[in-house]
Amino acid sequence: MDRETVSSDIKLAAEVDIDHSYSPGMSSVSQATLALLLALDLVHAKDITIVGRGHAVQNLAKYLTLGNATVTVAHSKTKSLLQATMNRDVVIYATPTITKDISYNTRDLVIDLGNSVPHPDRFNCPYVNRIGQLTVSVLLNRFARKEHRT
């Protein structure tokens, strides 16, 4: 079964995760990550690398670019993950495992959307069965607002 088949079975009226192929906007985890970066003033004129190319971060890269960040998207086929992550202001790891060399220094903000980066000062957002703390908080907020409107 593929993603399109599963997501097409979800009724749009009941969908709060914005994880439907016809849903406009970003996924919950992307929205929460963007909100964190905006709150910390880490978007405008910053160098950001996203490691991962999944559905959850595709729109995040677009919105970061619209916020005047320079965005690099790296993935398993990137020739030099080390070079792609070197000397960045923010590195977002949106992949369950890191299998290649990575680089970060003390000025980097590392956001690990899994639990795969050995950075001592990272914002770690571990997830169980693909659901992390950022996603849960945004989903609960959306559900509460939706219930309040009905």
What are these language model-derived features?
Residues D17-S21, M26, V73-A74, D112, ...:
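General beta-strand structural signal in soluble alpha/beta enzymes
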Residues D121-T150:
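Adenosine-phosphate binding glycine-rich loop
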Residues M1, S28-A32, M86, I131-N141:
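Conserved active-site and cofactor/substrate-binding residues in soluble primary-metabolism enzymes
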Residues M1, P96-I98, S116-V117, L134:
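Short glycine-rich anion-binding loops that position phosphate/pyrophosphate groups of nucleotides
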Residues H55, N115, I131-Q133:
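Gly/Ser/Thr-rich helix-start
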Residues V6, K11-L12, G114-R122:
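Acidic-glycine-rich active-site phosphate/pyrophosphate-binding loop
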Residues M1-S27:
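Phosphate/diphosphate ligand-binding glycine-rich loop within oxidoreductases
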Residues G25-K100, N105-L109, P118-R122:
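Glycine-rich phosphate/diphosphate-binding loop of Rossmann-like nucleotide-binding domains
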